[in-house]
Amino acid sequence: MWSWFGGAAAQKRKEAPKNAILQLRSHLDMLQKREKHLENQMNEQEAIAKKNVTTNKNAAKAALRRKKVHEKNLEQTQAQIVQLEQQIYSIEAANINHETLAAMKAAGAAMEKIHNGMTVEQVDETILRDKLREQQAINDEIAIAITNPGFGEQVDEEDLEAELEGMEQEAMDERMLHTGTVPVADQLNRLPAPANAERKALPFPPQKRTPTDSLPAAKAKQKAEEEDEEAELEKLRAEMAM
């Protein structure tokens, strides 16, 4: 029975912050509705005063007095709203701190239970540590074997060069079969070494462009410009006719 009463008391203490927050929020909702009502009353009395300011000054003054009363009540209501909001924030922050502390205590107790009977010396003496060291050594040996230059079949650079020259010769022979002539560059490459070097040293004569090379392009450009001008004139004539 005593444990039941103790549990009920603990539950009541746990629910106390939530109940307080609910009560404060309910009262805050009521004050916010009152704030909206007072603002509407002020706007209504101001409209009455503006309506009677030139025709009935007494009615206008009475409306302004009522507006002042509503304005004072509105200020008090807004101050109460601020106080309630601060109290709600304070209770929520305190409740969050309490829950966080309880969670930290539970985590500490769980870690203490997990580490019960475990020490650094015991971990160092276990076979697990020896197995880890053995596997690490094997991994290092494998890495060294993979990165060793002797790992795998090495490629002979001379064989690659010879194969590449053979492919170039086949391509050149194929071009000769298709064209029936030997290209100038291939003839130079087939000359003996001294003659080939001498021919390579001689520059090719530069090609000269004759003035007639650019005549077709210039005529085409001039014709396009004339067509554009004619189209522009036709457009202007159509606009003037309208």
Swiss-Prot record:
Q: Which InterPro entries match?
A: Snf7_fam
Gene Ontology CC: cytoplasmic side of plasma membrane; cytosol; ESCRT III complex; multivesicular body
Entry membrane topology: Peripheral membrane protein
Top-level taxon: Eukaryota
The disulfide bridges present are: none
> What's one GO MF term for it?
identical protein binding
A Pfam family (short name) is Snf7
* Major localization class: cytoplasm
Subcellular location per UniProt equals:
Cytoplasm; Endosome membrane
For biological process, the GO terms are: ATP export; intralumenal vesicle formation; late endosome to vacuole transport via multivesicular body sorting pathway; peroxisome organization; protein transport to vacuole involved in ubiquitin-dependent protein catabolic process via the multivesicular body sorting pathway; reticulophagy; vesicle budding from membrane
Q: Where is the composition biased (Basic and acidic residues)?
A: 233-242
What keywords tag this UniProt record? Coiled coil, Cytoplasm, Endosome, Membrane
Give start-end ranges for the coiled-coil region(s).
19-95, 152-179, 216-242
**Where is region (Disordered) located?**
187-242
Q: Which family does it belong to?
A: Belongs to the SNF7 family.
**Assembly and oligomerization:** A component of the endosomal sorting required for transport complex III (ESCRT-III). Interacts with palA.
Function of the molecule: Required for the sorting and concentration of proteins resulting in the entry of these proteins into the invaginating vesicles of the multivesicular body (MVB).
- Record-given protein name: Vacuolar-sorting protein snf7
The root-end lineage is: Eukaryota, Fungi, Dikarya, Ascomycota, Pezizomycotina
